[in-house]
Amino acid sequence: MATQTVDDSSKSGPRRTVVGDLLKPLNSEYGKVAPGWGTTPLMGVAMSLFAIFLCIILEIYNSSILLDGISSN
């Protein structure tokens, strides 16, 4: 016969670690959504500032903005 049965007593459960015990409270809120907008406006502000930063970097790269004393190849 090609199949083999294994006793449940020989299997061990998941191993507990210190890191796992520290991170478990973070996972306890999984799937729960706070009512309302929450931190959405803050994320919008952060994304806007990051987009402005990327535009400035792009303009410097394209030499649209010239910086005194800095030459680009």
Swiss-Prot record:
Q: What is the organism field in this record?
A: Cucumis sativus (Cucumber)
**Parts of the chain that traverse the membrane:** 41-61
Instruction: Enumerate the subcellular locations listed in this protein's record, separating them with semicolons.
Output: Plastid, Chloroplast thylakoid membrane
For this chain, the family text in UniProt reads: Belongs to the PsbH family.
Its biological purpose is as follows: One of the components of the core complex of photosystem II (PSII), required for its stability and/or assembly. PSII is a light-driven water:plastoquinone oxidoreductase that uses light energy to abstract electrons from H(2)O, generating O(2) and a proton gradient subsequently used for ATP formation. It consists of a core antenna complex that captures photons, and an electron transfer chain that converts photonic excitation into a charge separation.
Keywords assigned: Chloroplast, Membrane, Phosphoprotein, Photosynthesis, Photosystem II, Plastid, Thylakoid, Transmembrane, Transmembrane helix
The highest taxon in the source lineage is: Eukaryota
Tell me where it mainly resides: plastid
Q: How does it sit in the membrane?
A: Single-pass membrane protein
Query: What modifications does the entry list under PTM / processing?
Result: Phosphorylation is a light-dependent reaction catalyzed by a membrane-bound kinase; phosphorylation occurs on Thr residue(s) in the N-terminus of the protein.
Q: Name one GO biological process term.
A: protein stabilization
| Gene designation per UniProt | psbH
Identify the Gene3D superfamilies for this entry: Photosystem II reaction center protein H
Q: Which SUPFAM superfamilies match?
A: Photosystem II 10 kDa phosphoprotein PsbH
- How would you summarize the oligomeric state and partners of this protein? PSII is composed of 1 copy each of membrane proteins PsbA, PsbB, PsbC, PsbD, PsbE, PsbF, PsbH, PsbI, PsbJ, PsbK, PsbL, PsbM, PsbT, PsbX, PsbY, PsbZ, Psb30/Ycf12, at least 3 peripheral proteins of the oxygen-evolving complex and a large number of cofactors. It forms dimeric complexes.
- What is the official name of this protein in its record? Photosystem II reaction center protein H
Q: Which GO terms describe its molecular function?
A: phosphate ion binding
GO CC terms in record? chloroplast thylakoid membrane; photosystem II
Q: Which residues carry this modification: Phosphothreonine?
A: T3, T5
